[in-house]
Regions:
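Short hydrophobic core segments
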Residues: 31-33, 71-73, 96, 177-190, ...
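A Rossmann-like FAD-binding core segment of flavoenzymes
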Residues: 1-2, 113-114, 119-120, 133-173, ...
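Active-site-adjacent segment of FAD-dependent monooxygenases/related oxidoreductases
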Residues: 98-136
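FAD-binding beta-loop-beta segment adjacent to the flavin cofactor pocket
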Residues: 6-32
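Short gly/ser/thr-rich secondary-structure transition/capping motifs
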Residues: 12-18, 167-168, 202-209, 288-293
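Rossmann-like dinucleotide/flavin-binding elements
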Residues: 22-94, 209-253, 318-321
Length: 333
């Protein structure tokens, strides 16, 4: 069997990856990166990187006159694993997560999506053996791990800046400031959701992730985006009773999606389970309708909910301000 290689970016479309040493340290001494932000999207590998990074930090010595040995930013697989390892290593840690739940990118997977298919080793827990495990089961397991171990997570706390502080750092968030010897960045590449910047977007009917398709039963829903997450959201909604689904995408084709998703959308469109508007953009969001600009001209759609799946704004500018160097990978391992 041929070996599997991890490839970053494509030949034409590069991806910015932080410059990180084999010990997960950036060019800024004391700031580490593990998991998806560093290019590792596999759950098992991300969790392993989180554990290994904490081991490096443990060997470096104590916090000195700082409040924490390490501030861990992001509670996806890498951050969760790092937090457990910090407890096991008796480090003074602070784990923060900008959203209101753990799981990182996994939390944003569609319902019942297979999330992990390989064993993973977690500090305090040991080796966890899964066959194919769905998103919901994996998140429930992680919740159980948090309760069992007493892992402390600061939810809805978003990193806004990192300033040098003697031989350590001050991590500034929307909740305050944390003095720490080291910083471990384990947030994903989603960043904050990319917004449409159109009138009416601030209304409650606009969301940036699909959590439970059943809550939209019987509604007219607009899904905006052309990636796998947008297509999977539209397909999940189209399965619900009485739901009227329109998928709006600004380009002329779904060129960057999995073949199975493209085929499923084409089939659903043929069966009239959903409507696809390519080369369209949202102009305005109103209480009971949305205004689109389409290749055929202006269009008004009946609407009770808008789900924007337009990706995220990467944290690259913030990290560059901290001093972290990036390199653009084009289809390279």
């Amino acid at each position: 069997m041929d070996a599997i290689s991890l490839v970053f970016g494509t030949e034409k479309r590069g991806i910015d990856i932080p410059d990180v040493s084999p010990e997960f340290e950036t060019n800024v001494p004391g700031i580490f990166i593990a998991g998806e932000l560093g290019g590792m999207g596999l759950i098992r590998k991300a969790a392993e990187q989180g554990r290994q990074a904490i081991e490096v930090i443990r060997k470096r010595g104590g916090a000195g006159d700082h409040d924490h040995d390490v501030v861990i930013v992001g509670c996806g697989p890498a951050g969760l694993s790092a937090g457990l390892s910090a407890i096991e290593s008796k480090l003074r840690y602070k784990l923060i997560e900008q959203e209101d739940s753990l799981g990182g990118a996994v939390f944003h997977y569609p319902r019942n999506k297979i999330a992990m298919t390989a064993p993973v080793k977690l500090a305090l827990i040991g080796k966890v053996r899964f066959g194919e495990v769905q998103k919901e089961k994996l998140l429930a397991f992680w919740d159980q791990v948090v309760r069992k171990t007493g892992l402390q997570i600061g939810f809805r706390e978003c990193m806004q800046a990192v300033d040098k502080d003697g031989d350590g750092f001050i991590v500034r968030t929307n909740r305050g400031a944390h003095r720490t010897r080291n910083v471990l960045l384990t947030m994903g590449r989603r960043g904050t959701p990319r917004k449409l910047e159109v009138p009416g977007e601030e209304t409650p009917k606009v969301v940036y992730r699909l959590i439970d398709p059943a809550q939209y039963d019987g509604q007219a829903v607009l899904v905006v985006g052309g990636g796998d997450s947008a297509l999977e959201a539209a397909l999940a909604l189209a399965e619900r009773p009485g739901t009227e689904v329109t998928l709006s995408y600004r380009s002329e084709a779904f060129s960057r999606v999995k073949q199975k998703n493209r085929q499923a959308i084409e089939e659903a469109q043929r069966d009239r389970r959903l409507r696809v508007e390519l080369e369209s953009t949202v102009v305005a969001i109103e209480p009971e309708q949305v205004q689109l600009k389409t290749k055929a001209g202006p269009a008004t759609l009946r609407n009770q909910a808008v789900i924007v799946c337009a990706g995220g704004l990467l944290p690259t500018p913030l990290l560059q301000k901290i001093g972290i160097r990036f390199e653009t990978k084009h289809g390279t391992a």
